[in-house]
Regions:
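Positively charged, amphipathic and often flexible ligand-engagement surfaces
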Residues: 1-211
């Protein structure tokens, strides 16, 4: 289950690489924190390797700039993750509105789990070419529960919203995803929602390898 920890952009062409740390079911060893690994791909890979050595899974969420070097830096990140032997322990978010279908295909070919982000129309267009990619769904979007039901057999990242209504929608969507045969991921830093997700996973017979 995952808490989204995006990087922050400080320039027009450089990318900072944020990443999140999935929390295994039934164990929250310390409060979740925000991590920004640095401005270079090697920074992200170095810190990711440290977390993997602690027994964690890592989700890298690059925030690329809009310059000509954005695609090159992203390609370098993919190559370095693979060279470092982190493919089995990392998933990589591809901002398809900035980097497009080629970047998503490169990640998939490298053997990394892919999470697609961006405007829904862009994500859906790229998803058709990248089977198995995780599709983000916000719990406070109109019709989120219905869309989660349509996608429940695949890999869905559920994004938590804000407020009591969003929390209730989160739980409804969670019930749909956890009871299906897919691979749900939970994107929140709210320990209460993480605990609920753990309870729902256990109720549906899921172990940490199933989420």
């Amino acid at each position: 289950m995952q808490a989204p920890l995006p990087g922050t952009r400080t320039g027009h062409t450089r990318a900072h690489y944020g990443f999140d740390v999935p929390v295994r079911l039934g164990a929250v060893p310390r409060p979740l924190r925000r991590f920004v690994a640095g401005a270079r791909p090697e920074d992200a890979v170095r810190v990711a390797a440290e977390l993997v050595a602690e027994g964690r899974l890592v989700a890298l969420e690059p925030v690329p700039g809009r310059g000509d070097d954005a695609a090159a830096e992203f390609a370098a990140l993919v190559a370095q993750v693979r060279t470092a032997g982190l493919v089995a322990s990392c998933e990589l978010t591809v901002p398809v509105d900035r980097l497009g279908r080629p970047a998503a295909l490169d990640v998939a070919r490298a053997g990394l789990p892919v999470v697609l982000s961006g405007p829904p129309a862009d994500v859906d267009a790229v998803a058709a070419a990248v089977p198995g990619a995780a599709l983000p769904r916000a719990d406070d979007d109109t019709g989120a529960e219905s869309r989660c039901r349509d996608l429940a057999g695949g890999h869905v990242r559920l994004l938590a919203g804000r407020g009591a209504d969003a929390d209730l929608a989160f739980v409804r969507c969670l019930n749909v995803l956890m009871s299906a045969a897919g691979h749900p991921a939970v994107a929140t830093a709210d320990l209460r929602l993480i605990a609920i997700a753990g309870e729902r996973a256990a109720w549906n017979g899921r172990g940490h390898e199933d989420v």
